[in-house]
A protein has these predicted regions:
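Extracellular/lumenal ectodomain signal focusing on beta-strand-rich modules
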Residues: 78, 116-117, 150, 172, ...
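C-terminal subregion of chymotrypsin/trypsin-like serine protease catalytic domains
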Residues: 12, 17-18, 23-26, 58, ...
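Conserved H-D interstitial segment of serine endopeptidase catalytic domains
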Residues: 60-63, 81-84, 88-126, 197-199
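Protease-domain processing segments flanking chymotrypsin-fold serine proteases, especially trypsin-like
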Residues: 1-82, 95-100, 212
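Active-site region of chymotrypsin-like
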Residues: 54-65, 71, 143-149, 193-228, ...
């Protein structure tokens, strides 16, 4: 995969956050349109993170058409944040908070920067949800510390790794209650297991893209799988970006779908 095979385009488009994508009938429709999926991903009944133990986490907030949007992201260099395309598409600018545990507290460790420079993958299409990846360029380089640090990305030698069967975790400030959709002030996490994409295809009734990873919660856990854009991490390495879950709710046992980071290693401007 050549360095120039992918290119950036400035994020533009309509607001599709908090919109459930579903169909009323499966008759006569392609498989990709048959499944009901949600663009919202939230951690339900997750555990609170030890404060500042995940210094790579970024909280991404913006307002689109008078609607406040909250996403997750990860710091991949001192001036770049990795997130999902859906988190910046349609936005004119975003607030990126680093070094946070409790978003409602004025923690000394927190830094909030406003960026209007963010890019989505040129092949991203909301209807298909493939290539759901974007990079936010911060206006200045941030000082790295025990509170703000970059996350490790896979090596090129990891491109063929499916990670199936491996334990992973995802974190975010998303919902803690599937019914009331209450957001969490503090960073929370959930342990997951990477599962074969075939299991996702059974759940969602359409063929998964080659750039996607599926992960499920441990047996008996009623969760969704993290804020959109949040990193999926295996052994301290980010292998995925939270993309979407089921429209039927966060406690219905559907796996979460994540963008596969290894597919985009040569696309990232590092």
């Amino acid at each position: 995969m050549g360095k120039n095979q992918f290119s950036f385009v400035t994020a533009k488009g309509c607001n599709f956050f908090n919109v459930h994508i579903c169909t009323k009938s499966n008759a006569g429709k392609p498989a990709a349109e048959n499944s009901e999926k949600s663009s919202d991903l939230e951690i339900i009944d997750g555990q609170e993170v030890v404060p500042h133990s995940m210094p790579y986490m970024a909280a991404i907030r913006t307002v689109i058409n008078s609607t406040s949007i909250l996403c997750g992201g990860s710091l991949i260099s001192d001036s770049l944040v990795l997130t999902a395309a859906r988190c910046v598409d349609g936005a004119s600018e975003v607030d990126v908070t680093l070094g946070a545990h409790n978003l409602e507290d004025n923690e000394d460790s927190q830094i909030t920067l406003i960026s209007s420079s963010f890019f989505i993958h040129k092949d991203y299409r909301h209807s298909g949800l493939a290539d759901d990846i974007a990079v936010i360029e911060l206006p200045v380089s941030v000082p790295l510390s025990r509170y703000i640090a970059t996350i490790k990305l896979p090596e090129l030698t990891d491109i063929g790794n499916t990670y199936e069967g491996q334990e992973a975790l995802v974190a975010g400030w998303g919902g803690v209650n599937d019914v009331e959709q209450v957001k969490s002030n503090v960073l929370r996490y959930q342990n997951l297991t990477i599962i074969p994409v075939e299991m996702c295809e059974i759940s969602y009734l359409f063929k998964m893209q080659s750039d996607q990873i599926c992960a499920s919660a441990p047996l008996g856990k009623n969760i969704c799988l993290g804020d959109n854009g949040s990193p999926l991490v295996v052994n301290g390495v980010q292998i995925g970006i939270a993309s979407y879950g089921s429209v039927f709710g966060c406690s219905m046992g559907f796996p979460g779908v994540f963008t596969r980071v290894t597919k985009y290693l040569e696309w990232l401007p590092l």
